[in-house]
Each structure stands twice: as C-alpha cells, then as structure tokens.
A protein has these predicted regions:
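Soluble FAD-dependent oxygen oxidases
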Residues: 1-331
Length: 331
C-alpha cells in the first residue's frame, strides 16, 4: 500500500478520475491493495474523526472528499467461475475486466453502457444494464458482499449465459425530434427489450438491446444519420469508454410520463440556456420498481443545477424518487 499526502508526487494523479471538473481534496490518500489495507485506512479515519470516501474511477463523483480517500484502483482482481456462472470482483475492478474474462465462457454480467465504470459502485447504486428490462437490476444478482466496516471490498455475483445479443442504435437529426419522441413513446415495448432515448445537441439517439429478436422499423420515422442494428457479441453492446471530461447531471424516477409532458421536457431542455442532454429509459419488465421511467439530464459543465431543476419541474408531479447511478457533481 502507498500513502499520499498533499504535495507528494502522485497525490494529484491518485485523487483524479473520470470527472475532470471536480477533484477530491483529501488530507490523506490510502492507495489500498487488499482488505487489510482498507482496514488500516478506515481505522485511521475513525480514530481521527475524519470522513472516509472510496475512489475507483471517479465516474460517480458527487461531493469531493476532504478527509481520508481510499483509492481502490490497485485492488482490482476479477475471478470467473464458469461452473457456478459467478464472478468475484474486488473494489477497484471495472466492467471491462469482467466482460473480457467472462465472454470466453459464453457468459456476461449485467453491466451498463460504459465498460470502464467500476463494478462495485455501479452495482451498489442498483445497476441499470443494457439488458435491464430483460434481467433486472445488477444488484439483484449479488450473491455475496465482502466489507470492512461500511467499505465494500468485493462482490460476488451471478453471470448470465449470454454470448450474442440483438442490439443497435438509430441517430436522427434533431429537427425530427418531435416525431422520434412520439415514435419512441408509443412503442408497444416487449418486456425483453431495453431501449434508451438520448438527445446529444443536434442529434437524437435511440439504442436498444435484447437477447431475443425484435423489430425497430416503426422507429424509422425520419431519415437516419446512423442506422445500425443486428446480432453481435455482448461486448460490442456493452458500451465503449469515453475520455475523461467535465460534467454535471442528475435524474428522477417517474411513475408516469404522458406524451405532452415528454414534449414539454424536451422543449425545456432545448431552451435551458446551457447544453442539457436528456436521457430517457422506460422501466418495467424485470425491473421490480414502482417507477415507469428514468429521466436523466447531463451537461458538459458545472453549475447547472438550477437549469436541470427547471427541466425537472415539468415532471415534478410524477416523481417517485432518484437513482443513485446517475448523480454527478451534485450534493
């Protein structure tokens, strides 16, 4: 284990992560390699009355830590048991490691759309995978949790017998947003299909995945900029890493989302005065939750909480909660 203090060589690298707009400001960093190291870090914090925060990739950074930072990047072992179809991932492991080791056995985890995200943080937040409506939350598959105090040091979880999936994406020019939103909203969605709708500036993107065949012809309501759909290895549908950048985002869980309200949300995001990218995921299927939709907002800059809340005002009467998975740079 290495220990870093402000001013030490390596301190800045150790406290940095995927989120470049915020960085932790800890008094000390414990770069742990095993559970015994974690125990020492937690003991250091508790005996000095300091808070302790776990840091792996930094994707989900909400509030910068000022006490003890427990960096788990070196504690990243992954073990696959093809006989029991399970995986054990240490606190610093990322999904790409699990995918690469599981795929030769025809197995796959319930990972999300970014393979460089940490396994533990994602799963503890619930875990909305690219196959969520077909198989449920990633957290539903956890068999065993290993902990030191309140710090999770490893998870053991089920893998699924998945080799190939039916998946793809459609991109449209934003001038066709109204028609695309209506087609997406009216989709008589099979329980085994997990779709998302995302606005990306001048583009509206639809994605979808399932282990079983399904049809998306009804979504082609305008000329497509990208039209890619077919059978492919799970790893190709599991998302590609993005470069580190600055961003702020939040989400709400809704128990209904009428079409007219969805259009108001779209218009509010477009007129926010700052870039606001909207993401919508229908829930249901194997996701055991009262919510019917997950609505998330993200911007490539900080200081936009007010603008996001003004967009969320359009759905306030339908809000039943928030997901821990999609909260970035917010308290």
């Amino acid at each position: 284990m290495r220990i870093f203090y402000p001013g030490d060589t390596g301190y800045d690298d150790e406290r940095s992560g995927f989120q470049t707009g915020l960085r932790h400001e800890p008094q000390v960093i414990f770069a742990v390699e095993n559970a015994r190291d974690v125990e020492q870090a937690v003991h250091h914090a508790e005996t000095r009355g300091l808070d302790h925060t776990v840091h792996t990739t930094g994707h989900g950074l909400t509030t910068p830590a000022t006490g003890v930072l427990i960096s788990t990047r070196r504690m990243n072992n992954v073990e696959i048991d093809p006989t029991t179809r399970t995986a054990r991932a240490e606190a610093g492991a990322v999904w790409q490691q699990v995918i690469e080791q599981a795929s030769p056995h025809g197995l796959a985890p319930l990972s999300g759309d970014a393979s460089d995200v940490g396994v533990v943080g994602y799963t503890l937040g619930g875990g909305f995978s690219v196959l969520a409506r077909e198989f449920g939350f990633a957290s539903d598959r956890v068999r065993k949790t290993e902990k030191v105090g309140d710090v999770v040091t490893a998870l053991e979880f089920d893998l699924l017998e998945i080799d190939q999936v039916h998946a793809g994406e459609l991109h449209f020019d934003a001038e066709h947003a109204e028609a695309v939103f209506e087609a997406f909203h009216s989709w008589d969605l099979p329980d085994h299909v997990t779709p998302t709708l995302t606005t990306l500036g001048d583009v509206v993107r639809l994605t979808f995945a399932s282990t079983r065949p399904f049809d998306v012809d009804h979504l082609r309501v305008a000329p497509t900029l990208i039209d890619e759909f077919g059978r492919k290895p799970f790893a190709e549908a599991a998302g590609k890493p993005l470069p580190p950048h600055t961003y702020q985002g939040d989400n709400v869980l809704l128990d209904d989302l009428p079409l007219d309200v969805l259009h108001r949300v779209r218009q509010a995001a477009s007129n926010a005065g700052v870039p606001v990218f909207l993401g919508l995921m229908p829930l249901g299927g194997a996701l055991k939750t009262e919510a019917t939709h997950l609505l998330k907002l993200i911007s490539p800059l900080l200081g936009v909480e007010q603008q996001h809340e003004e967009v969320f005002d359009e759905v306030r009467s339908f809000v039943v909660g928030r997901s821990r998975n999609f909260r970035y740079a917010v308290g």
